[in-house]
Amino acid sequence: MSESIFAERIVQNLLDTDFYKLTMMQAVLHNYPNAEVEWEFRCRSSEDLTPYLAEIRYQIERLSELSITADQLAFLERIPFIKPDFIRFLSLFRFNLRYVHTGIEDGQLSIRLRGPWLHVILFEVPLLAIVSEVRNRYRYREVLLEQAAERLYQKLDWLRAEASEDELAGFQLADFGTRRRFSYRVQEQAVHILKRDFPGRFVGTSNVHLAREFDLKPIGTMAHEWLMAHQQLGPRLIDSQIAALDCWVREYRGQLGIALTDCITMDAFLADFDLYFAKLFDGLRHDSGDPLEWAEKAIAHYEKLGIDPLSKTLVFSDGLDLPKSLRLYRALSGRIHVSFGVGTNLTCDIPGVEPMNIVIKMIACNGQPVAKISDTPGKTQCRDENFVSYLKHVFRVTQ
């Protein structure tokens, strides 16, 4: 009999999250321990999720039972930039449910987080994984693990047939599939298959628990929230990206050197990404807009600053699959190093299954609005239209 694709308890340990949540959490502990934030869930489709509210609440309540184990702490201690005081903080950390508010608002599922940034930062990824898996339990009860494995092997066979040996030797891929996975067991199976059978270079996973389980490198640096929060953390708005990057440099001293570029837009980011930052950071991550146009802007920027693009890396993570990744690899080969973070296409691509398009984004910091504009207008998220207009005015965004 086939193993069930679903587990009764969806999130079973504290490290079943994306690595960049921990790297940002450490930076928040050291720099902004008193910052207050608000987050909001959004389903970008018209799907009605309200029938699942009771089960979602039950799974959220079970998060409060989790604590980090000695073995998990030992794994984190081996990462050179994870500091002893942060390890001690994690040893005491528990999910505090008073910061989570669920319900139905305007006929739609509502999830809000309000509280200290340090204590709500880890909720985002498990909440998204819970919503996704609860919904999939109801809609796709008959799906088997073998179906997910078969689909993934078809993709690996395609890549093996399509790419040359030389291309495969340099083709770097990481799993970024935690937040919108079909289920935990599908992601676990996918990472196991990729480690064992990926024909290119499987460099790791964003999921800290799975990195530990399969002896892989945990992958991730910063998310949009890091740059967004700095819009209300003290500096002038025009200096917010500079402040976010500078704080990151002081925290990690050259480690974790991939910067995210589309909190405002790529053009606004590059205006702040001067020679100092361009030398200090190892590269950039793409998460919206046309990836090739973005890459050309990045390469031109490095060249303008007198930096060899081949000393830098571009990480792509926006809605990728293997064919898109291979096209980008071929287009940029020999010009700049590239790596690909593939998410939903690895962990929720099963025949007959419609993946969810859900996010939880920061909407306020210290009682004031924050926003992400991005290089794809549909990805803008902020409840305050006046603040979005002001942000665009300050950064001279014309879209």
UniProtKB/Swiss-Prot annotation:
Superkingdom of origin: Bacteria
One Pfam family recorded for the sequence: NAPRTase_N
Known catalytic reactions: nicotinate + 5-phospho-alpha-D-ribose 1-diphosphate + ATP + H2O = nicotinate beta-D-ribonucleotide + ADP + phosphate + diphosphate
UniProt keyword annotation of ATP-binding present: no
One GO cellular component, as annotated: cytosol
Modified residues (Phosphohistidine): H224
UniProt enzyme class: ligase
Record's protein name: Nicotinate phosphoribosyltransferase
